[in-house]
Design a protein with these regions (language model features):
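Two-component/phosphorelay signaling modules centered on CheY-like receiver
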Residues: 14-32, 121
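The feature encodes the CheY-like receiver
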Residues: 17, 61, 89
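Acidic, metal-coordinating helix/loop segments flanking the phosphotransfer/catalytic sites
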Residues: 33-53
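Acidic catalytic/metal-coordinating carboxylates
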Residues: 35-36, 64-68
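Short amphipathic alpha-helix used as the core "switch/output" element in two-component signaling
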Residues: 42, 66-77
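The short loop immediately C-terminal to the conserved phospho-acceptor aspartate in CheY-like receiver
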Residues: 58-59, 119
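Alpha4 helix (beta4-alpha4-beta5 surface) of REC/receiver domains from two-component response regulators
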Residues: 67, 87-104, 112, 116
Length: 124
């Protein structure tokens, strides 16, 4: 079944953006990817109503995923956000709850888990 809303994927590693875009597109999602969070934020400002979900890495230059998520929420308070990090989840719990992210994925993320967690985040 095709999805009508888009997902914004932001990670400073191009390979992750490409793999996520391919995996989610196979499940009918329209996916737009950025390796620069500042450019992603500018794009989101212009197109926020089109996005059902933002998936972002936590650690990226020049803006962290937490900063990006806070900016996304300032633009669209009901935005759904999934953060991902290779670092321990316990170190991130406070920040995740502070911005009210819908989920936190631990890198590396297998594609089956990614698709399942995206479905859950978008349904809530």
């Amino acid at each position: 079944m095709p999805h009508t809303q888009s997902i914004l994927v932001v990670d400073d590693e191009l390979d992750i953006v490409v793999i996520f875009r391919q995996a989610l597109a196979r499940h009918g999602y329209a996916v737009f990817g950025f390796t620069d969070p500042a450019l992603a934020l500018e794009h989101f400002k212009l197109n926020s109503r089109d996005y059902a979900l933002v998936i972002s890495a936590v650690r990226m230059p020049p803006m962290s995923g937490f900063e990006l998520a806070a900016s996304v929420k300032a633009i669209k308070p009901d935005a759904k956000i999934v953060l991902m990090s290779a670092f321990e989840v316990n170190d991130l719990e406070f920040s995740t709850s502070a911005i009210k992210a819908n989920d936190l994925l631990r890198k590396p993320v297998d594609m089956k888990t990614l698709v399942q967690r995206v479905r859950v985040a978008m349904a809530n």
